[in-house]
From Swiss-Prot:
UniProt record similarity statement: Belongs to the bacterial ribosomal protein bL9 family.
Keyword Cell wall biogenesis/degradation: no
Gene name linked to the record: rplI
GO biological process: translation
UniProt keyword annotation of Ribosomal protein present: yes
Name of the protein described by the UniProt record: Large ribosomal subunit protein bL9
Organism: Amoebophilus asiaticus (strain 5a2)
Taxonomic lineage from the root: Bacteria, Pseudomonadati, Bacteroidota, Cytophagia, Cytophagales
HAMAP family xrefs: Ribosomal_bL9
Protein purpose: Binds to the 23S rRNA.
Length: 149
């Protein structure tokens, strides 16, 4: 049975995609729960139109993410941390601290879940963070950890 998904469904497909599933799965679970529609001609046309609009929105979001990446890559972000002897930080720099520094110094609001590090940051100096701005746009941001006075 062919159905049109109303939202992304892990292991099955993406929103507005036409997929084939077993009739019982469609009738007893996907359609009653509101996850899918029967793929008749009318619904197929609506899904195609929605897919075109969604593709246009995604292209715009990608373009916006690229412009943000260009702007952020040119900035020098500084993060203050409490330091012990030998220049070692108490604890480690976290994605939340990076997100807060970005918001404070640039005005860009980043989700902490989109920020990652290659390895834990426990020393002073220049380091890199990987920020996922979009599915296809990933920024490697250089930042400096300085001692808090």
């Amino acid at each position: 049975m062919e159905i049109i998904l109303k939202q992304d469904f892990k292991g099955l497909g993406y929103k507005n995609e036409i997929v084939k599933v077993k009739p019982g799965y469609a009738r007893n679970y996907l359609i009653p729960q509101g996850f899918a529609l029967v793929a008749n001609e009318t619904n197929k046309k609506i899904a195609q139109e929605n897919a075109k609009q969604m593709a246009h929105k995604m292209a715009k979001r990608k373009q916006d993410a690229e412009s943000i990446a260009n702007r952020l890559s040119q900035l020098a972000i500084k993060i203050k941390a409490k330091v012990g002897e030998k220049g070692k930080i108490f604890g480690a720099i976290t994605p939340i601290q990076i997100a807060d520094a970005l918001k404070e110094q640039t005005g860009y609001i980043a989700d902490r879940r989109d920020i990652s590090f290659e390895k834990p940051i426990k020393t002073l100096g220049t380091h890199k963070a990987i920020i996922k701005l979009h599915k296809e746009v990933v920024l490697t941001l250089s930042f400096e950890v300085i001692a808090e006075e």
